Amino acid sequence: MVTLVLGAQFGDEGKGKITDLLSQTADLCCRSAGGHNAGHTIIHDNITYDFHILPSGLISPKCVNLIGSGTVVHVPSFFKELKALEEKGLKDANKRVFISDRAHVCFDLHSVVDGLEEASLGGRKVGTTGKGIGPCYSDKASRTGVRIGEVLDEGIVERKLRNLEAGYRRRFGDLTYDLEEEIKRFKEYRTLLKPFVVDQFTLLRKYKDASILIEGANALMLDIDHGTYPYVTSSCTGLGGTIQSLCLNPTEIKSIVGVVKAYSTRVGSGPFPSEQINEIGEKLQVTGREFGVTTGRKRRCGWLDLVMCRYSTLINHYTALNLTKLDILDDFDEIKVAVAYRLNGKEVESFPADAEELEKVEVVYETLPGWKVNTMGATKWEDLPPNAQKYIEYIEKDLGVPVRWIGTGPARSHMIERL
């Protein structure tokens, strides 16, 4: 039995909390894509945990966790994050997390190159996290990268890393990067990593009849194939990428949970049709505390975009939705939702593939009444004011997918579940 949790917008939807909730009954929790560019926060027993590369199933004491073959792993960050969790009380975390030997290694070299590539784009920067994710996936695609399993062989790592550095030096000239220092560090990591490295196929076979939870990173609109290219991440963040990365049997997928924030946010560059560059956007940013967990950057804010969510639903085939941060809308007199795009006076029939075209669309909004009632901490559907219920029902009707979970605050308990 497999359950997927996938971001339906631009990331930062709040996937961590629903993953934490579902992991309480899961035997295995897996990350399928991305690296330490991802970031989410979970509050449990008044303790705040920040996750980047590690699966958030680690908070559940009986849940085993896997970082799958489609990911890229920055080894220093892996150990730093693991240590931080242990210092906050998760003492056995290092015994419940494993890394696929087919995952790729994200070196410090990749971070240096990431910055150089962004600088070369000038005014058309992608707005990456600067963590080296793109260059690492590029090396993977060009068949020059290093896999986690190869770290256990000192000779392979040194040879491949020297080749990578030489290639980038030919491209960029001088690099502010210490090759010998990174080679030295990986000699130490060879021993430290060994207990964590597994053949994921053997592990997944062991759990074939168990409850498996897949934790998506980033979101559909940042997918390398289906997102707002080129303003995307470098991995497949949707349903297809998840199946590929973890070799899932599609017929065993029980549910696909799409996580949708009650409004829209985006970090970095790229088209954002419903963005509000005004006092509404500022209010959403301040009230919603919209700052990136990984970079600390301010998130751009706007109204919920149902055109985008329909497109996301079409690709990821959600069976249920988790609507998050409903309480952030409590103080609005009226709430708008994007229901259509117009371009050159005509309604756009399908979601534009061209980012420049998407930047030019005129958004058609539906205006719904606000509720002006505090919903933070609500745990029952009946606790919500009528207009908040109508807002949720409007989303359900438009997308054709039931909203099963509603987030009403930052704590694990701040969640409404509708059966």
Curated annotation (Swiss-Prot):
Stored InterPro entries: Adenylosuccin_syn_GTP-bd, Adenylosuccin_syn_Lys_AS, Adenylosuccinate_synth_dom1, Adenylosuccinate_synth_dom2, Adenylosuccinate_synth_dom3, Adenylosuccinate_synthetase, P-loop_NTPase
EC number(s) on file: 6.3.4.4
Cofactor: Mg(2+)
Binding site for Mg(2+): 12, 39
Binding site for IMP: 12-15, 37-40, 129, 143, 218, 233, 297
Residues the record lists as binding substrate: 293-299
UniProt keyword terms in alphabetical order: Cytoplasm, GTP-binding, Ligase, Magnesium, Metal-binding, Nucleotide-binding, Purine biosynthesis
Quaternary structure and interacting proteins, as annotated: Homodimer.
Family designation: Belongs to the adenylosuccinate synthetase family.
Protein name, UniProt field: Adenylosuccinate synthetase
Organism ancestry: Eukaryota, Fungi, Dikarya, Ascomycota, Pezizomycotina
